[in-house]
Amino acid sequence: MALVLRLMGGAAGMGAKAVGGACCELGSACFRQITKGLPHPTECGCLGSLFFYLGIHDHQKFNVLVEIHELDRVPKSCSLYMTIEAGRWSATSQVVKVKGQDQRVVVEERLMVHIRQVDNEVKIFLFKKGLVKTTRLANLVLKVKEDMIDKKFPKRTWYNMKVENGKSQPRINLSLHKLDPGLPTNQSPLLQQAMLIAQQEADEKGEELKLDLAKMTAKERLTFFSQVLEGPLERLNANGGACMQFYYKAVEVKPDRWEWCYWESAAACKEGKEKEGSIPFLAISLVLPDRKNRNVFFVRYHDKDNQHDVFFRRVDRDRNLWSDGLYEFIEKLRAYRETCSTRVPSQKGADGEEKKKKKKRREDGEDSSGEKSPRKSGGKKSRRPSTSPRLDISTARRLHSPRAQVPSKSPCAHQQMYEEVMISTQSSVVGDEEPQT
């Protein structure tokens, strides 16, 4: 009996220790989470400047844009994602899948975090996502001063990651970009790329970036965002033909009329030579990334008589920057046009409208009093061809989101994707029509 009581007491003691240890661990985790969210005194502007000029801190606060290009030497046939941590800020990438025996995967994703004065390192973790649990495979620690500032924020550099679990030894290809600390970290792709271009131009000139979007007019913001859609692209028509490379640029060809113009080269564009062609932005009704090929996206646009389907292949930047940026710019341009249309017209505009109404009444055979005059018996319609410009679809209903994905598994990926887009578009249009009797 005494032995049984002794065993029961020992078991109770071990259970109490286990419960106590678990409670302590939980309490410490909660304490770390709470203290992690508390701001540091140097986040105050005056204290931060004082600490920096006294030499206590070796850098001031800034935002860093981490561009993840590729992963290499990763496990086969798995799902991976990355997390970036810097002080109180963190960001998580989307899940990328490693297919078959391939141990190299293209990521092409951007994550932005805020670096405080007190932060000395940025940590990047690589996770393997499974059905039951998630495993942390490796990590990379970048020193803010030594690896970023002193090396002038290196671009497309390979880093070997420290292995935590598994047999593979991953490495990661990164580009680091320094941005203004006043910018929000949750930016849209269009704003993010526009700010990055502006920052790079300021760095090349050796000037400080002074940019305030809130003080810009709607027209100035459109011009600022339009630079995102400038660069080389390979163009392939949906009906076949050779793939040709052009240099594209968003241009305001007339007041409030924007077109996506293209030249044979960047030099031809900058020298002011005649453009090869153009696509009105408001005539674009569909922007669709290719699901199977991260380098390709599909665009459908319209002119007066026909619709045109074109595939584009990226050259020097991620495909999503083109497709998402194109979609966002069209939405902003459409909103700007709608805002302009609600304004009170000037006297010159009112006179123009009155002249158009009078001309229309004369064509319809109305007299000045508003009553229709009898049409002459021998009258003929004018054979003069129509001179109306290309169709400007400002109210076109978007059929697909730019982030929508159309599967294509056959070797002729472009052709199958085009056929499925045609089928889905026709079904959407037919579904809106009333049944004919």
UniProtKB/Swiss-Prot annotation:
Q: Which UniProt keywords apply?
A: Cytoplasmic vesicle, Membrane
Q: Which domain of life is it from?
A: Eukaryota
Q: Bias category Basic residues: which stretches?
A: 375-384
Q: Which InterPro entries match?
A: PH_CERLI1
- List the Pfam families hit by this protein, alphabetically: PH_CERLI1
Pinpoint the PH domain residues. Answer: 230-338
Q: Which stretches make up the C2 domain?
A: 45-179
Q: How does it sit in the membrane?
A: Peripheral membrane protein
Under the cellular component aspect of Gene Ontology, which terms does the record hold?
cytoplasmic vesicle; rhoptry membrane
Q: Where is the signal peptide, in residue numbers?
A: none
Q: Name one GO biological process term.
A: symbiont-mediated perturbation of host vesicle-mediated transport
Does Methyltransferase show up as a keyword for this record? Answer: no
Q: Which segments carry the region annotation Disordered?
A: 341-437
Tell me, according to the record, the phenotype of the null mutant.
Intracellular replication, parasite egress and motility occur normally; however, host cell invasion is severely reduced. Complete inhibition of rhoptry secretion without affecting microneme secretion or rhoptry morphology.
**Where does it localize?**
Cytoplasmic vesicle, Secretory vesicle, Rhoptry membrane
Under the subunit heading, UniProt states:
Interacts with RASP1. Interacts with RASP3.
Q: What is stated about domains?
A: The C2 domain is a non-calcium binding domain. Cooperates with the PH domain in the binding to phosphatidic acid (PA) and phosphatidylinositol 4,5-bisphosphate (PIP2). The PH domain cooperates with the C2 domain in the binding to phosphatidic acid (PA) and phosphatidylinositol 4,5-bisphosphate (PIP2).
What's the stated role of this polypeptide?
Answer: Essential for tachyzoite invasion of host cells by controlling rhoptry secretion. Binds to phosphatidic acid (PA) and phosphatidylinositol 4,5-bisphosphate (PIP2) lipids and thus, likely contributes to the assembly of the machinery that docks or primes the rhoptry to the parasite cell membrane prior to the fusion with the host cell membrane.
User: Could you identify this protein by its name?
Assistant: Rhoptry apical surface protein 2
Q: Gene of origin?
A: RASP2
